[in-house]
């Protein structure tokens, strides 16, 4: 008879898995700009942010830690680039807006806990599982999780800034497994990114589940993820864990 799998650790992505922004980035940026006397279209800022974020992440990955930057400075530079691409050339006028945005994005009021997150985390705890965060976030994450009432569910929070490696780098997953003192085969990761979360965890021998994010899934991605690994919502996780652990006994 096959040995029944008993998971011991669940690691979690955060943004668009457990939390999401209450308002789109462009709206947040435009609102703060208006409070400082600067009128910029939210749509233009949203588009500029996507372009600036991609460029900044490619030039200075993982908050520029390898280039001598702090995550704080990385974000201030990104805000400056966003406004510049949206047509605002006055860096001095943008500076206080950037500082305010950095502070506001640290606040729990900017974030919303996704439906089913708290109940699912409680359910996982009742199963005796260790829970941890593995997120490509910066040092503000601990305070954000504390502020929205989710920090108490986790044994530890591991950010890419603290670890030194962003997902899908296998080293951040190995570090989480080391901190939890469990083997990959009894760990599972939950997140909304196919590359960073689903594939990243599987590359180190963990199980993983893909959460439906705000954007439609690429059909090719959906075809490559078994139905039992796909979570239309967080409330589907506990039944998926039952199926995973039960299926090992049926092998």
From Swiss-Prot:
Q: What is this protein called?
A: Haloacid dehalogenase-like hydrolase domain-containing protein 3
The reply on keyword Acetylation is: yes
Residues recorded as bearing N6-acetyllysine in the entry? 15, 130
Gene field: HDHD3
Question: What Gene Ontology cellular-component terms does the record carry?
Answer: nucleus
* Keywords, in A-Z order: Acetylation
Keyword check for Acetylation, yes or no.
yes
Listed Pfam families: Hydrolase
N6-succinyllysine (modified residue): where? 15
Question: Which Gene3D superfamilies does the UniProt record give?
Answer: HAD superfamily/HAD-like, Haloacid dehalogenase-like hydrolase
Which family does the record claim for this protein? Belongs to the HAD-like hydrolase superfamily.
InterPro entries recorded = HAD-like_hydrolase_domain (IPR051828), HAD-like_sf (IPR036412), HAD-SF_hydro_IA (IPR006439), HAD-SF_hydro_IA_REG-2-like (IPR011949), HAD-SF_hydro_IA_REG-2-like_cap (IPR044924), HAD_sf (IPR023214)
């Amino acid at each position: 008879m096959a040995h029944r799998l008993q998971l011991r650790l669940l690691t979690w992505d955060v943004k668009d898995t457990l939390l999401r922004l209450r308002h789109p980035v462009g709206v947040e940026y435009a609102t703060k700009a208006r409070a400082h006397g600067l009128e910029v279209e939210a749509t233009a800022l949203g588009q500029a942010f996507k372009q600036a974020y991609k460029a900044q992440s490619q030039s200075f990955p993982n908050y520029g830690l390898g280039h001598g930057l702090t995550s704080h400075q990385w974000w201030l530079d990104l805000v400056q680039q966003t406004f510049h691409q949206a047509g605002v050339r006055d860096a001095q006028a943008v500076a206080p807006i950037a500082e305010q945005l950095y502070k506001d994005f640290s606040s729990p009021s900017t974030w919303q806990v996704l439906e089913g997150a708290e109940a699912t985390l409680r359910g996982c705890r009742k199963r005796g599982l260790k829970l941890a965060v593995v997120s490509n976030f910066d040092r503000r994450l601990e305070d954000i999780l504390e502020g929205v009432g989710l920090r108490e569910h986790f044994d530890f929070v591991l950010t890419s800034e603290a670890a030194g490696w962003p997902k899908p780098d296998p080293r951040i997953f190995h570090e989480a497994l080391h901190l939890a003192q469990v083997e990959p085969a009894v760990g599972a990761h939950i997140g909304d990114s196919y590359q960073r979360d689903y594939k990243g965890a599987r590359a180190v021998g963990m199980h993983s589940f893909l959460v439906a994010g705000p954007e439609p899934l690429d059909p090719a991605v959906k075809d490559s993820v078994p139905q039992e690994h796909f979570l239309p919502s967080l409330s589907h996780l506990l039944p998926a864990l039952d199926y995973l652990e039960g299926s090992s006994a049926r092998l």
